Amino acid sequence: MSPRISVFAALAASFLLSGCIFSETPKFPAENAVAVFGDGGRFQGYDRTEDGRYKKADEAIFIVKRRGDGGYDFVDQKDEVQPISFHPIAGGNFVGQAPENGKSRYAYVVFRIAGNEAFIYVPDCDKQDKAQLKKLGVAIGQFECKIDRVADPAAFFASLTLGEPTSKLVRE
């Protein structure tokens, strides 16, 4: 997986990411979702460049709307909506759980909130300890990891090697 996944690719439409982590059913209950973005707001996306700096991403302005079920709707500039819920894990991070558009499965990313910035990590299955993943119940595919048999998803995500953030959102 390329470490240069854009904010738009990470959040918009379908969460179709090579090297992604997914499940056929949600691993985190909706009622345990937390309000990491408060009541929501307007956010500008930035992509991380090879030198570690961030560059404003084209077409990456999101309106984040809080839903009644504890999750959020990320609405892009084309009015496409990506529902997502956030769940706390160790280390002060949050797992974003989102249904993939057009598929009956869920994709996952990790967020770290720092003031008005949200750093987005897309854990790459290829860069994880394969023996440890199998021990935890992960089904390893060619470009993705299926976590339906993982008993403790919060501990699983907290144990992953996240690498560098691929992008960030900044509240406007």
Predicted regions and their residues:
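Bacterial N-terminal signal peptides that target proteins for export
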Residues: 1-9
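Calycin-type beta-barrel ligand-binding domains and close structural analogs
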Residues: 21-39, 46-59, 65-172
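C-terminal motif of bacterial Sec signal peptides marking the signal peptidase cleavage site
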Residues: 16-19
